[in-house]
């Protein structure tokens, strides 16, 4: 590559390259190029106007103003960021021979070798200055290229890791959604089956339980009625027996009183007869007390 009118040099001898010139030769999509251009730090990128631009003075600006359009200029660092995005023969020449030839042309214009006191070939002095400048430029270019390669490699690795992570998360989300759908369908199926079973089983069981409850209630009522009748009969028998015993006791008392009256009148009952009657009275009284529940313990 030979020097052309797409570069300019500022007061610090920093070379600035037209970004449009790099875009036209890099064969890069416009959106990608613009994204890279605006990602370059501002100290390595500047915007100038072709007409009336104080930064483009006749001694240092190598290309003439053409119109009033705005141009973006980048230094060697910015040019490396743009050119190394898609490595090609142009990017290799841009960062080597293109830069060297433009600096050589700039040095020949801006730093003429003073005439020495003694006659010496002017080529030797200019060659020494050019070689020193080129050596410094080569070292700076190597550092810039190495830094950009490392940055590009790190960014590529980070993008790859991020892409893999996103793909993994996407796959896990798909698996989770599928599992949730399967679980939901299974739960709904089981619930529907359970509801159907309950609806089918509860009416029969309710009728059976009601029938058994009615039978049990009838049996309990029958037993209670029977027991109630038996108890009433037993109570009646006991009441009648107690009344009979009371009547017997009254009869015996009357009989005893009559017998004692006879004995008081000088009747024929002796002590032995009287004792036998008393024993009969005691026995009947004891039987009555037992039947009426008043027996002595």
Swiss-Prot record:
Keywords: Membrane, Viral envelope protein, Viral occlusion body, Virion
GO MF annotation list: structural molecule activity
Pfam family, one: Baculo_PEP_C
Presence of the UniProt keyword Membrane in the record: yes
GO CC terms: membrane; viral capsid; viral envelope; viral occlusion body; virion membrane
Localization of this protein: Virion membrane
Entries under InterPro entries matching the protein: Baculo_PEP_C, Baculo_PEP_N
Principal location: virion
Family: Belongs to the baculoviridae PE family.
Function in brief: Major component of the polyhedra envelope.
Name of the molecule in the record: Polyhedral envelope protein
Originating species: Orgyia pseudotsugata multicapsid polyhedrosis virus
């Amino acid at each position: 590559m030979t020097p052309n009118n797409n570069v300019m040099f500022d007061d610090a001898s920093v070379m600035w390259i037209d970004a449009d010139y790099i875009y036209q030769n890099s064969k890069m999509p416009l959106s990608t190029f613009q994204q890279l251009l605006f990602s370059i730090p501002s100290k390595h990128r500047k915007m100038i106007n072709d007409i009336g631009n104080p930064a483009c003075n006749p001694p240092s600006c190598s290309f003439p103003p053409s119109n009033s359009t705005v141009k973006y200029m980048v230094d060697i660092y910015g040019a490396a960021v743009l050119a190394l995005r898609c490595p090609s023969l142009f990017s290799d020449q841009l960062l080597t021979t293109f830069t060297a030839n433009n600096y050589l042309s700039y040095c020949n214009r801006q730093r003429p070798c003073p005439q020495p006191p003694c006659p010496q070939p002017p080529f030797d002095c200019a060659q020494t200055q050019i070689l020193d400048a080129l050596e410094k430029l080569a070292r700076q270019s190597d550092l810039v290229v190495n830094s950009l390669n490392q940055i590009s490699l790190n960014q590529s690795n980070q993008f790859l890791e991020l892409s893999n992570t996103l793909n993994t998360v996407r796959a896990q989300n798909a698996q989770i959604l599928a599992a949730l759908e399967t679980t939901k369908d299974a739960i709904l199926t089981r619930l529907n089956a359970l509801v159907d079973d309950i609806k089918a089983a509860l009416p029969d069981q309710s009728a059976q339980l009601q029938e058994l409850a009615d039978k049990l209630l009838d049996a309990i009522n029958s037993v209670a009625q029977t027991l109630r009748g038996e108890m009433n009969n037993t109570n009646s028998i006991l009441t009648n027996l107690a009344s009979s015993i009371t009547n017997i006791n009254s009869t015996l008392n009357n009989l005893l009183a009559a017998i004692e009256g006879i004995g008081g009148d000088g009747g024929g009952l002796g002590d032995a007869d009287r004792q036998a009657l008393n024993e009969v009275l005691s026995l009947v009284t004891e039987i009555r007390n037992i039947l009426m529940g008043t027996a002595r313990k």
